[in-house]
């Protein structure tokens, strides 16, 4: 039965295990929500605004179905966009987006209809009637979200995180420090960003010393607002020792507008990653590394819509073990590090790294891997090579508040089924299975990130 009680649960032990974890609170250490939207607490106007307006998963699949861009990110009305989505939605079967959006519809709206061209109008009208009462803060409480960490630039004032402590009840909203723009000396706009950091923190960032001082001040500012982790997007990690004089020369050259060599770019990035590690060591933050996303791969999309619009891909030609070796050994026993990989063929590398370094953790199945298939493969492999007990928990990685419940439910069902299979095969006792699914679903990530 579609989305029935046994959805994704194929054995009796799995049903029992899921029933024990399904109502646990949600702790999400990595997502892309905007704290401003939560603080302002404005209800959504329609189902497209909730499900499609910010979700590049939806955009990509609509494009795959031949839908014109004007019905995705263009000038068409939200209703026209929803109707266009519903028309092709049956083609989404097998993709987790099909299940997530139906779970949203069934669990949050209590509308148990299958999305199609025939039901699109009814769903539009029914959701429109219910949305005025479904504010962001109410939804977070209804979904039992206990803690969530947004992803924020070091230049941010964090004013909405500060306000959230005053006006948001029952949910803790924390920032995450993401200094990618500081490190990416090869990207357009780097100098302007460095100058902005100088203005924000009162430092002369034309010098390396001034820039590092601004970053330290930013780090402290985030700490004061409850930050517990940093996050770093790395296509291919390449961290090694770089002398500060070398980094200073590259910084000054880049700031003056001169073109850098690839070696200079690599050296600067390696140097900065070590500085970020030292900062996190001071505050005992968790360091999250998201590895392997080749971003903005489709040029025409990036030129017209910018980043995070559905033009990113996965690639497996990465030297992860070699690139991380210096960083991991430099901070061995000094940092908690969580590794996420986009290509599943890299899972053996990070799982065995975690096995070798007690303070390294394998992150949740990420992005293209957060489907039932990807999750099952991820969990089974991790259990067989490292410790499933030590998985860094589930992250929604979402830009869409409504999906917190559906993404978490899917993960907990898959987890329960994987562990339930072990019980049914006689591999583990039910008592240990119960403790395992509870730890991975809630206790483990809460302890790792939020102590």
From Swiss-Prot:
EC number: 5.3.1.12
Keywords on record: Isomerase
Reactions the enzyme catalyzes: D-glucuronate = D-fructuronate; aldehydo-D-galacturonate = keto-D-tagaturonate
Pfam families given in the database record: UxaC (PF02614)
EC primary class: isomerase
Pathway where this protein functions: Carbohydrate metabolism; pentose and glucuronate interconversion
Superkingdom of the organism of origin: Bacteria
Single GO term (MF): glucuronate isomerase activity
UniProt-listed NCBIfam families: PRK02925.1
Protein name: Uronate isomerase
Lineage, broadest ranks: Bacteria, Thermotogati, Thermotogota, Thermotogae, Thermotogales
């Amino acid at each position: 039965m579609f989305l029935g009680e046994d959805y994704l649960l194929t054995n009796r032990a799995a049903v029992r295990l899921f029933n024990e974890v399904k109502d646990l609170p949600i702790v999400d250490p990595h997502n892309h929500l905007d704290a401003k939207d939560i603080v302002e607490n404005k209800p959504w106007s329609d189902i497209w605004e909730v499900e499609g307006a910010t979700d590049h998963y939806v955009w990509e699949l609509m494009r795959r179905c031949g839908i014109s861009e004007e019905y995705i990110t263009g000038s068409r009305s939200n209703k026209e966009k929803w109707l266009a989505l519903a028309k092709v939605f049956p083609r989404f079967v097998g993709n987790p987006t099909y299940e997530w959006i139906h779970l949203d519809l069934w669990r949050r709206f209590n509308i148990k209809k299958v999305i199609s061209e025939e039901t699109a109008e009814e769903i539009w009208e029914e959701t429109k009637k219910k949305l005025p009462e479904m504010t962001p803060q109410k939804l977070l409480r209804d979904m039992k979200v206990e803690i969530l960490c947004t992803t924020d630039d070091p230049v941010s004032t964090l004013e909405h995180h500060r306000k959230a402590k005053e006006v948001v009840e029952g949910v803790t909203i924390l920032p995450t420090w993401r200094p990618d723009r500081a490190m990416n000396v090869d990207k357009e706009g780097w100098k302007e960003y460095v100058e902005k950091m100088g203005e924000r923190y009162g430092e002369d960032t034309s010098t390396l010393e001034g820039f590092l001082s601004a970053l330290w001040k930013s780090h402290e500012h985030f700490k004061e607002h409850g930050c517990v982790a940093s996050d770093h997007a790395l296509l291919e990690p390449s961290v090694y020792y770089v002398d500060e004089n070398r980094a200073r020369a590259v910084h000054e050259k880049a700031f003056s507008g001169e073109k850098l060599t690839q070696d200079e770019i690599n050296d600067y990035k390696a140097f900065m990653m070590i500085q970020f590690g030292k900062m996190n060591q001071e505050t005992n933050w968790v360091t999250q590394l998201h590895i392997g996303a080749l971003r903005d791969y489709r040029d025409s999309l990036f030129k017209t819509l910018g980043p995070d619009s559905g033009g990113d891909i996965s690639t497996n030609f990465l030297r992860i073990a070699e690139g991380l070796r210096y960083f991991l050994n430099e901070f061995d026993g000094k940092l908690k590090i969580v590794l996420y990989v986009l290509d599943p063929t890299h899972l053996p590398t990070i799982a065995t790294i975690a096995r070798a370094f007690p303070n390294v953790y394998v992150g949740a199945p990420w992005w293209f891997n957060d489907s039932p298939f990807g999750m099952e493969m991820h969990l089974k492999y991790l259990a067989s090579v490292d410790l499933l007990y030590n998985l860094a928990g589930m992250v929604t990685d979402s830009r869409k508040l409504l999906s917190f419940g559906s993404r978490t439910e899917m993960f907990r069902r898959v987890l329960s089924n994987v562990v339930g299979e072990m019980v049914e095969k006689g591999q583990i006792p039910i008592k240990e299975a119960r403790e395992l699914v509870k730890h991975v679903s809630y206790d483990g990530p809460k302890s790792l990130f939020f102590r």
